[in-house]
């Protein structure tokens, strides 16, 4: 027990001295953390509210009802299921509910940002779906005209857009017209940009024509780790999704998430516009400074990004992982990532992916992004000792330890 206590303490101490730029992570506020730790973490609630397979859930039903109704109201949806315990399981449930083995679907492809669950190696392949890809331009934007032509040709059961890399809003309205002609549904995987959508500064998928939003709840949306499905869909499809969530792909759905998820939505309703706006400003500032310092930042002709993400081409196959490893030694945490031109093999990507949402949560703004870019340059381009830079990174991070854009204690 002592060793485990020590390891956990060391992790906490180290991460408080790091600049975390992982695009798929965030931190909850102290208020939401308090909601997260409760007796609910010990309980089971198979089924949907008021139709359970266990007793003792009178308050759980009220909590889950409240969470789902608030998310439906905020996102303008007529359906919400907060039970998926991850974004991947949300995708499994949504895909299974509206397709059958052998159906064809269109995704972005991993080169252009789709999550592995959209692909043959993940949920789509496991469900027996035939996956083909939408078309992209060289500037990291979707080619709507060619993609619509492919929809008309392939006649997919559904298309899935959004995903792991999403620098710019996607052309939902244009795709909707083609999907309507062939009877295809649109699933928008908002895992990375849910907070930006909630704040009204990215795009509004349901208003623009998506049928279903699948998502996780812990990236730009700073809630507990978990998943969710939202949509404007018919009652039969709603029931199919609910049946896919349970019993097909999960049992209990980690009840202690629910109060914290509600708290995070309330925080976004109060502070989200300022928070999300600063996230994007920070991403653009970091991208510009990296570009000015000599890095090959993608999508420069389009202003680099309109989300929390920045993509950098590190030059050669495998350099993404090499640079990420060097930066980790300097207490700068980010990840290697496939970029356009890498193909589908994730082992030796040329790119790195950067996200600004967590450091923004701790109060960093454009000046701090410029300083982070300089740290990255010193390690990657100037070949300074990562361990030496790590000391300066720790001192820099020491001034940013308080979670912002949240209710005070």
Predicted regions and their residues:
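Conserved PLP-enzyme active-site core in the AAT-like
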Residues: 66-296, 314, 356, 364
């Amino acid at each position: 027990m002592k060793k485990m206590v020590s390891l956990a303490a060391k992790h906490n101490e180290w991460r408080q001295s790091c600049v975390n730029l992982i695009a798929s992570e965030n931190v909850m506020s102290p208020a939401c953390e308090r909601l997260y730790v409760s007796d609910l973490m010990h309980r089971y609630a198979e089924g949907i509210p008021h139709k359970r397979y266990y007793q003792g859930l009178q308050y759980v039903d009220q909590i889950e009802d409240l969470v789902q109704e608030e998310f439906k109201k905020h996102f303008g949806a007529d359906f919400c299921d907060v039970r998926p315990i991850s974004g991947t399981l949300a995708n499994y449930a949504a895909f299974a509910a509206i397709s059958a083995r052998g159906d064809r679907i269109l995704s972005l492809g991993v080169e252009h940002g789709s999550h592995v669950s959209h692909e043959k190696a993940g949920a789509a392949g496991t469900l027996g779906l035939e996956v083909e890809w939408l078309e992209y331009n060289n500037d990291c934007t979707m080619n709507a005209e060619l993609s619509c032509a492919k929809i008309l040709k392939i006649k997919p059961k559904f298309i899935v857009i959004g995903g792991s890399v999403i620098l710019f809003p996607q052309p939902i309205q244009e795709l909707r017209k083609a999907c309507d002609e062939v009877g295809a549904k649109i699933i928008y995987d908002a895992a990375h940009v849910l907070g930006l959508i909630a704040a009204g500064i990215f795009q509004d998928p349901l208003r623009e024509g998506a049928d279903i939003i699948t998502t996780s709840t812990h990236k730009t949306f700073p809630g507990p780790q978990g998943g969710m499905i939202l949509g404007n869909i018919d009652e039969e499809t709603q029931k199919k999704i609910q049946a896919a969530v349970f019993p097909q792909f999960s049992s209990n759905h980690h009840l202690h998430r629910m109060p914290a998820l509600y708290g995070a939505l309330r925080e976004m309703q109060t502070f989200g516009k300022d928070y999300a706006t600063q996230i994007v400003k920070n991403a653009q500032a970091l991208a510009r400074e990296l570009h000015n310092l000599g890095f090959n930042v993608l999508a420069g002709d389009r202003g680099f990004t309109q989300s929390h993400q920045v993509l950098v081409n590190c030059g050669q196959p495998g350099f993404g992982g090499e640079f990420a490893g060097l930066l980790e030694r300097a207490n700068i945490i980010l990840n290697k990532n496939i970029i356009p031109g890498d193909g589908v093999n994730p082992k030796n990507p040329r790119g790195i992916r950067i996200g600004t949402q967590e450091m923004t949560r701790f109060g960093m703004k454009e000046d701090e992004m410029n300083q982070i870019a300089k740290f990255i340059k010193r390690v990657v381009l100037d070949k300074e000792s990562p361990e030496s830079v790590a000391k300066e990174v720790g001192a820099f991070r020491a001034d940013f330890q308080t979670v912002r854009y949240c209710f005070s204690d």
